[in-house]
Amino acid sequence: MGFDDMRRFCEMHDRKIPVFASPATMKGLRNTFRYVFDEPQVWKNYLRIDPEEITAPFQLGETTIVPVDLPHGRFTTTGYVLHRGGRKLVAYFTDCSRVPGEAVEAAHGAEVLILDTLRDTPHPTHMNFEQALEASRSISPGTTYLIHLCHEVSHADKEGALPSGCHLAYDGLTIKAGM
């Protein structure tokens, strides 16, 4: 599930990791990874977290982070829109099967949109290319990066077929926003 993989960072830095999640997600994490939430934790190599339930926009430094509910099949995930200096810098929408109107409105005009796109054909919990490109058009970002691509997607074939300002993300990609 990936969550437990963060324990290495606790070992390296000898401190807790802040974890931001919706109340429903936090409940699921507590049920699945009970030992992480139990105090005291006697093993240094256990994942140690500082849980923070997200129920409203919050601040990290000068950045305001606005949580946005997104459908992921029958579940709800959380996307984020990052604001700084009155500008929408980044909208991060992954693990979603569509982008509802409230999320489109929250992200509209963001400088960068990072958007879930699994493959060409429909999928019950992720957007396909057609759905993602429609969501991108509705949001009207400066640049869109499509993420969460499956093994069926050929970067060489797809990248050239995308509309202007839309790109396939890749491992190691660095995105600059608000510069």
Q: What is each of the regions a protein language model found here?
A:
Residues S97-G178:
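Cap/insert and terminal regions of metallo-dependent hydrolase folds
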Residues M1-F93, A156-M179:
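Binuclear metal-dependent hydrolase catalytic cores
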